[in-house]
């Protein structure tokens, strides 16, 4: 299993979140998941909201096009990005096969 997959025009990411980091950044792979460090604390949904905003900015989409599919109260999360406009340089990330 890869840390991402395409579902039509949507990109699904399997993430491992590290809250309360010194800066927001991708930190390589953590097993079969993309490790993401965020400055937000893991309280009252702040880290989740920060994650969605961070990914929206990186993939060039409005925040409304990024949603948490699973892992609301866990470090292991699955996120859907609807029709990403840009792809960051991440290990193994390839454009949609039919693009």
From Swiss-Prot:
Chain spans, region Disordered: 66-99
Gene3D superfamilies: YggU-like (3.30.1200.10)
Pfam families reported for this sequence: DUF167
GO CC, any one term: cytoplasm
Organism: Azotobacter vinelandii (strain DJ / ATCC BAA-1303)
Compositional bias per record (Basic residues), positions renumbered to this chain: 76-85
Name of this chain's protein: UPF0235 protein Avin_03050
Family: Belongs to the UPF0235 family.
């Amino acid at each position: 299993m890869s840390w991402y997959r395409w579902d039509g025009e949507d990109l699904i990411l399997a993430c491992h979140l590290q809250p309360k980091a010194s800066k927001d950044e991708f930190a390589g792979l953590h097993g079969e998941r993309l490790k993401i460090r965020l400055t937000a604390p893991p309280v009252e949904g702040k880290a989740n909201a920060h994650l969605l905003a961070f990914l929206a900015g990186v993939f060039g989409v409005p925040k409304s096009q990024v949603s948490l599919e699973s892992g609301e109260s866990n470090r292991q999360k699955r996120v859907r990005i609807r029709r990403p406009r840009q792809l960051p340089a991440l290990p193994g990330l390839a454009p949609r096969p039919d693009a």
